[in-house]
Each structure stands twice: as C-alpha cells, then as structure tokens.
Amino acid sequence: MWTIPTYILAAFAEIGGCFAFWAWLRLDKSPLWLVPGMASLGLFAWALTRIDADFAGRAYAAYGGIYILASLIWMWAVEGTRPDRWDTIGAAICVVGAMVIIFGPRST
C-alpha cells in the first residue's frame, strides 16, 4: 500500500514549496527560491492525484492530518524549533482522524 508514503511525499513537497515562498517573502531570500518552490508544489499536486481514493475531497481530508504532522517535523528539523506538548497533542488528534478516514471501512 502506497497511500501513506504518497501522503508523506505530498506533505513534504507542499511544505518545501510553501517554505520557498516564506523564505523569499519573510526571510529576504532570493526570488530564485521560487523556482524549486514551484516545482515542489507541482510535485505535491501530482502526488495527491496518486492517492487511492474514490473522491478528491476524501483524499484531501485525510491528507490534512498527515500534513499537520509533517509540518511539525519540518519545524523541528528545518527551523530548529521543537514542537511543544500542545503541538504534539493536536497533531496526534489530527493523525488519528486521518487514519480513520484512510482505513475506515467503506460500503461499496
């Protein structure tokens, strides 16, 4: 099953792409940061279309929980700020919700 790895790929591609814009606009980095940023956002959009889901909305809803966890990992690994207990509790709640959406039984 490639669902979880694909969500993880999508999350880090989106975060990386958005961070390129953040770096340009908030950290005074070169506009050249936008080139890999836009490519990363393209990878993000492509990855979400690879999710095994019948409906885009369901794929996006489940992705939200994975994205939140990945964002906190990014904050810790790239920005050097460790998530606090409220970040951790909130992310855990969201990931549980995402897992219910991803793995919940569906009537066919």
From Swiss-Prot:
Pfam families: UPF0060
Highest taxon listed in the record's lineage: Bacteria
GO cellular component: plasma membrane
Keywords annotated in UniProt: Cell inner membrane, Cell membrane, Membrane, Transmembrane, Transmembrane helix
Record's keyword annotation contains Thylakoid: no
InterPro entries (alphabetical): UPF0060
Regions crossing the membrane: 4-24, 31-51, 59-79, 85-105
Subcellular location: Cell inner membrane
Main location: membrane
Keyword Membrane assigned: yes
Annotated membrane topology: Multi-pass membrane protein
Family: Belongs to the UPF0060 family.
Protein name, UniProt field: UPF0060 membrane protein amb3269
Organism of origin: Paramagnetospirillum magneticum (strain ATCC 700264 / AMB-1) (Magnetospirillum magneticum)
